[in-house]
A protein has these predicted regions:
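Non-catalytic linker/capping segments at the edges of enzyme domains
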Residues: 1-55, 156-159, 163-171
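Residue-level recognition of well-ordered beta-strand positions that form the cores
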Residues: 49-51, 95-97, 111-113, 127, ...
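A generic structural signal for short beta-strands and their flanking turns/coil linkers
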Residues: 19-20, 32-34, 44-46, 88-94, ...
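Hydrophobic beta-strand-centered segment that forms part of the acyl-chain substrate-binding groove
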Residues: 75-109, 114
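A conserved, well-ordered hydrophobic junction motif at loop->secondary-structure transitions
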Residues: 47-71
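Short beta-strand micro-motifs enriched in acidic
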Residues: 39-41, 113-117
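HotDog/MaoC-like acyl-thioester-processing domains
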Residues: 1-14, 102-104, 115-171
Length: 171
């Protein structure tokens, strides 16, 4: 998988979020996962950039729709972590709209925004943008808090890993 350095135009999203060891979406030690890194502005917005390798394709040259849904699911969940990186939530509902085919081998940008919170619930929106800036897919999600025994940071290997660009651990 091609890993891109932190996007310079992230509009204030400079706080690197933690990753886990083996999560499919963010596990940096998962050899068959997406290995996504996320940055937030500590106020509800999260960004990530990546290039999807060909082994995640469905139709030739196109990212499998399930992989697209997984990326959108991960970033909506991370919007709830912008104020507390150890606040784990699960997706209760994910409404994905595929707007155009998502190519493999090209730069993609994920953006997520926390819409609101109420008690144990949160609502978020995410977009996946293609290299030309066009909208490839989007999702709206309802999230809910999980039991702290399930989301134990130590058991997940949850920590801020150094940037792959070699610039350190971020903020």
């Amino acid at each position: 998988m091609s890993i891109l350095p932190f996007p310079a135009d992230a509009a204030g999203a400079t706080h690197r979020q933690p990753n886990s060891r083996m999560c499919f979406a963010c596990g940096l030690e998962n050899p068959v996962g997406l290995q996504l890194s996320f940055y937030d502005d500590r106020a509800g917005s999260v960004v990530a950039e990546t290039v999807i390798p060909a082994h995640f394709q469905g139709y030739p040259g196109r990212t499998h729709g399930g992989v697209v849904a997984a990326m959108l699911d991960e970033i909506v969940g991370r919007t709830a972590m912008t104020e507390d990186p150890n606040r784990f939530m699960v997706t209760a509902k994910l409404d994905v709209r595929y707007r155009r085919p998502i190519p493999v081998g090209e730069k993609l940008r994920l953006q997520g925004s926390l819409i609101r919170r109420k008690g144990r619930l949160a609502w978020a929106h995410a977009e996946l943008r293609l290299a030309d800036g066009s909208l490839g897919a989007e999702a709206d999600a309802t999230l809910m808090d999980i039991d702290s025994s399930v989301g134990d940071p130590a058991a997940l290997g949850w920590r801020v890993y150094p940037d792959r660009s070699g610039e350190g651990e971020g903020g």
